[in-house]
Amino acid sequence: IVLLLRDSEKNRKKFANYLNDPSVKIVWGDLKKYDDVLKCVEGSDYVLHVGGMVSPSADYYPTKTIQTNTTAAKNIVDAVKAQPNKDDIKVVYIGTVAQTGDRNAPIHWARTGDPIKISIYDHYAISKTIAESIFAESGLKHWVSLRQSGILYPDILKNIDPIMFHVPINGVLEWATVEDSGRLLANICEPDVPED
């Protein structure tokens, strides 16, 4: 397991238990730096791209969000293409249900094949849609984009921000837990997952 982590005091504290774990290699770096991404992709069978700028930061820094999320996607695609076994590497990109807009009737629940319908001023969804198109148009043999819902994380109630009013009154809430999201990513890497 190779982790590309932004070098911050918070991340160093959060991942301190893994620093001496021989099964985990931590690369302190930046998704916007190709060489950092390349270090992580070399020798990989799977690339799970779960990093980037997310809301609510995306609302405050829209230009940085678009730059970060699209540059990260391009760097991952380029790093995979640089590998001698590029056709064997499986890439999982985490998109967002925000790419398909608000959940008003008649589209209350997300489904495979929902059209792209970004809500106005949603720079996060714009960045994720552009990044998804980078993977879709990359020519990589094995890639998937999972348009994930919001993530319930332990400190969510400490995050008092106007983003909590983004859900329209007639909309629905679609959430997944941190644990379920991790379980999904782990299961994708199992050998019995079909090629298609």
Which stretches of residues belong to each language-model region?
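Conserved beta-loop-beta element that borders a ligand/cofactor-binding pocket
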Residues: E132-P154
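Conserved internal alpha-helix within the Rossmann fold of NAD(P)-dependent oxidoreductases
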Residues: A73-I76, E132, L185
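Alpha-helical substrate-binding/gating segment
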Residues: Y153-P154, N159-P162, G171-D196
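Conserved glycine-rich Rossmann-like NAD(P)H-binding loop of the short-chain dehydrogenase/reductase
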Residues: I1-K10
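Glycine-rich NAD(P)-binding loop of the Rossmann-fold in SDR/ketoreductase-type enzymes
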Residues: K32, K64-N75, I118, D122, ...
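Conserved Rossmann-fold NAD(P)-dependent oxidoreductase catalytic core, especially the SDR/UDP-sugar
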Residues: T71-Y121
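NAD(P)H-binding glycine-rich loop region in Rossmannoid oxidoreductase-like domains
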Residues: S23, W28-T68
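SDR active-site strand-loop-helix element
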Residues: L4, V47-M53, V91-V97, G101, ...
